Regions:
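Charged, amphipathic alpha-helical linker segments immediately N-terminal to NTP-binding catalytic cores
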Residues: 1-21
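Nucleotide phosphate-binding/pyrophosphate-handling subdomain across enzymes
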Residues: 42-44, 131, 135-139, 147-160, ...
Length: 323
């Protein structure tokens, strides 16, 4: 099977920097300038950081925005099967021709200068987002937040920090507080931020950062709460109560993720119908996904098979609670 043109370009991009991860924004700013600063021409950005639940929260927010009739860009990582999964333009996965053209343009603008794979592909994605009309961009952090390639948006419409857990300590720091400090690096002056449930050590750091930069926080179990009650999702904030179906995404942890998504949608002025769409319409593969078809399921008749991409202690706790 011949490789797609984008696969060939992506393979070349892997060789532009000796490290897969090297956290700094210098190279990103250089390339964005060479590309004409596409990050300044984006639709309203919802910037999402956190250790666990970023993808699920993003998927629910996208479902809610789309239920309200909005055209939504989305940027996520990593991908499961094909790189194209990382970039949605106005609700649709990017097509091969468009992806190859964006990667070509970013590669030509960068030349031989060192840059990591995630940095150059993020810059390419910004080109696509800037050139395609949409009402919102859901922008998921790749790693950390403060020095992540996505953290070049001066004034997002909203920030979201999902639960922080121990992960990638070699890059983000050896303690929960240090990791939370990196995640809180996405907070911006005057930009509201939804904060999912946090351990006290993480919450203290997030609150200190928010106070330092002047970012208003909308915090789980203080300003909003979500809970399961009689097979319904109950969400409450100062605007009132929503009685909604349980999230379509399985897992007890999705109650918290749904709460963060709904909190964000309500801060952006969306109504109850959009919030219901957020919990009933999302799809997010490999997150507590039961395998009922395919060769693996056929090879284990009578056995329940579940697929989940969790890879840190917080995710392990969530999986155990669900099972």
């Amino acid at each position: 099977v011949s490789a797609d043109p984008s696969d060939v370009i992506l393979a070349r991009m892997m060789s532009l920097h000796p490290k897969i991860i090297d956290l700094t924004l210098d190279r990103v700013w250089r390339l964005l300038a060479a590309l004409g600063h596409p990050e300044r021409a984006l639709p309203p950005v919802i910037h999402i950081a956190g250790t666990n639940g970023k993808g699920s929260t993003q998927a629910m927010m996208r479902a809610g925005l789309e239920a309200a009739g909005q055209r939504v860009h989305a940027y996520t990582s990593p991908h499961l099967v094909r790189f194209h999964e990382r970039i949605r333009l106005a609700g649709r996965l990017i097509e091969e021709d468009a992806l190859a053209a964006l990667l070509d343009e970013a590669e030509a603008a960068n030349g031989p200068d060192p840059i990591t794979y995630f940095e150059i592909t993020t810059c390419a994605a910004f080109l696509g987002f800037a050139r395609t009309p949409a009402d919102a961009l859901l922008l998921e952090v790749g790693l950390g937040g403060r020095l992540d390639a996505t953290n070049v948006i001066d004034r997002p419409a909203l920030c979201v920090i999902t639960p922080v857990s121990m992960d990638h300590e070699a890059y983000l720091g050896p303690t929960l507080g240090a990791i939370a400090g990196e995640k809180a690096g996405i907070l911006k002056r005057g930009v509201r931020a939804v904060i999912g449930p946090q351990e006290p050590a993480a919450m203290a750091v997030i609150e200190a950062r928010a106070e330092a930069v002047g970012a208003p926080l909308f915090v789980a179990n203080r300003d909003w709460q979500s809970r399961r009650e009689r097979d319904r999702l109950i969400y409450e904030d100062d605007r009132g109560l929503l009685d909604l179906p349980l999230p379509a995404l399985p897992g007890v942890h999705q109650i918290d993720n749904a709460g963060a998504a709904i909190a964000g949608l309500r801060l952006m002025g969306l109504d109850a119908a959009a919030c219901e769409g957020a919990v009933t319409r999302p799809e997010w593969p490999a997150r507590m996904q039961r395998l009922t078809r395919g060769p693996l399921a056929q090879s284990a008749p009578g056995i329940e098979l579940w697929l989940d991409g969790g890879h840190n202690p917080g995710a392990g706790v969530a999986i155990a609670a669900t099972l």
